[in-house]
């Protein structure tokens, strides 16, 4: 998977008004010139193993997560788009005859708060700590661009590169802990533009 991340604006609003339940206005944080440091990417929806052809078995469950902490060139989220980061993932083809629907995939971007204290989805995220924003990759979304003539029906396809362009639109849905990517009850805080190079590209707002 090829991942790029940027901020929609040079300032980002937090979730203070909702968390504090008062007349307090949301805090507006300025994105540092060097950007918000990206320290990792977590990719859900992975099978526990694959067959000889590198496709999941018909009995496979897709509840495993890849945690990639090797970020290319120390990427950071800012107004301009970052250099891409690459993560090797497994095909997530669902071959089950009982429920053949191809699943969406949740991806979490891990960042270091180098801006200042702010309020996320569940509470305070202090300066210097790590926080997490989640994006949803849906192969059937209108923001998913598929190669012409290539019948792609899932997020990850062997011999293809899935391209996910994440955009941070606010800090309101930021977590102060790693969220469980196996549940659908999750705050999606990234906008995604998805496409494939012989695969998919996602443009996702966070």
Question: How should each PLM-predicted stretch be described?
Answer:
Residues 156, 165-206:
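Intrinsically disordered, low-complexity repeat and linker tracts
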Residues 1-158, 202-206:
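Tryptophan-paired
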């Amino acid at each position: 998977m090829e991942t790029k991340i940027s901020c929609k604006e040079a300032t980002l609003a937090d979730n203070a008004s909702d968390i504090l339940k008062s007349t307090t206005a949301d805090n507006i944080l300025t994105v540092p010139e060097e950007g918000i440091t990206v320290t990792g990417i977590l990719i859900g929806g992975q099978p526990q193993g694959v067959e000889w052809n590198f496709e999941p078995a018909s009995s496979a469950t897709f509840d495993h997560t890849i945690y990639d902490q090797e970020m290319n060139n120390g990427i950071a989220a800012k107004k301009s788009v970052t250099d891409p980061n690459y993560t090797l993932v497994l095909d997530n083809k669902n071959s089950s005859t009982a429920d053949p629907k191809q699943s969406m995939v949740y991806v979490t971007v891990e960042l270091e708060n180098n801006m200042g204290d702010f309020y996320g989805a569940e509470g305070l995220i202090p300066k210097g700590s790590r926080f997490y924003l989640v994006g949803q990759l849906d192969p059937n979304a209108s923001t998913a661009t598929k190669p012409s003539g290539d019948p792609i029906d899932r997020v990850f396809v062997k011999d293809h590169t899935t391209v996910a362009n994440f955009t941070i639109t606010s800090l309101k849905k930021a977590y102060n802990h790693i969220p469980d990517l196996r549940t659908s009850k999750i705050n999606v805080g990234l906008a995604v533009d998805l496409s494939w190079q012989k695969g998919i590209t996602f443009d996702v707002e966070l």
